[in-house]
Amino acid sequence: MANDKPHMNLAVIGHIDHGKSTTVGRLMFETGAVPAHIIENFRKEAESKGKGSFEFAWVMDNLKEERERGITIDIAHKRFDTAKFYFTVVDCPGHRDFVKNMITGASQADAAILVVAAPDGVMEQTKEHVFLARTLGITQLVIAINKMDAVNYDQKRFEEVKKELTQLIGMVGYKAAEILFIPMSSFKGVNISKKSPETPWYTGPTLLEALDTFKEPDKPTDKPFRLPIQDVYSISGIGTVPVGRIETGIMKKGMKVSFMPANKDGEIKSIEMHHEEQPQALPGDNVGFNVRGVGKNDIRRGDVCGPADIPPTVADEFTAQIVVLQHPSAITVGYTPVFHCHTAQIACTFVELRKKLDPRSGQTKEENPTFLKSGDAAIVQIKPSRPMVIESVKEIPQLGRFAIRDMGTTIAAGMCIAVQPKQMIR
């Protein structure tokens, strides 16, 4: 099935229980991506387990264990079409310990829907997700003020939440004037695909119309091919099949490739997308590909595939610009948290704190600071504990952004501004 519409990867972000999965389920239902009889089956099953309101969210939660726990765990790729685009949803789980999934999910997204429940307004994770979306390079955002049915579609409450959100997104550099705020109810289907009489005071677009205001992402096809691996399968009769999303460049059948830092070479035998074989694939495409000459155990999640003649850069050390989101005390030289960069998760050490910056202007405030605390921006030198692929944001921004986590929370986020490459023996 060739799809002539441009493709967008869409992250759905926001605090736990604000209705992210229900919103995705409703979008898929309203666009015909989920047949009505399947929704009906989900509804019956949900009612029998005492979770009547979960009917649309269950479209996403098609894993048994998740259904019973009532939460969405791993990132689920689902697709639906609007008039202008076809979207692949990168569903970003909302529970506290899943922020790292949010990081790897958001780094694959071209745009995001921020879901905020009208009764609660801005919550802790709303802030964290907005900050991460911005740091990870998501420039396009639609804000869904959800659960309006729970506040009787009150315009005053909508305006209060909108004001709160306008301040929050302004702090991280989004321009509120360019962002659409939609009063809606995913559960009731209000303002998703058609205007609702419940909100006569609202004259703006529906959620689906708002998604079509996004600008088509530039496809960085002129850059070297890069694909961070999400999973590796071994399929009988076919062989080794890595899966991932192309970040830059063009992937072609017959191409000679290198996997780094595994330092393994192979050849692409076939490429599959949405269960159909393709001769080539472009940035933004989620693909599985069969590779000759590489065993399942030779490569793993976090490795990056690139052309054999321009392999991905493996860092010995790298220089980064970071913003500290929250740290219980202070970051000093020697601190070794976990860096989440594309699909890799690697412990890295702060070997030098070069300068503290003014987070708004980027001007240097202090040379060689002794520590960094929450709210500080800085230029730092980092040494990975084992080989990792990271690229300068000037060269390949998609592989230059990262989040730093420790003790189950996101400590900081940042980008790589220079790499001291490790010499790989070929």
UniProtKB/Swiss-Prot annotation:
Residues 185-187 are annotated as: G5. Residues 91-94 are annotated as: G3. Residues 14-21 are annotated as: G1. It is found in: Cytoplasm. It catalyses: GTP + H2O = GDP + phosphate + H(+). PROSITE patterns: G_TR_1, G_TR_2. Residues 5-221 form the tr-type G domain. GTP binds at residues 14-21, 91-95, 146-149. GO terms for cellular component: cytoplasm. Belongs to the TRAFAC class translation factor GTPase superfamily. Classic translation factor GTPase family. EF-Tu/EF-1A subfamily. This is Elongation factor 1-alpha.
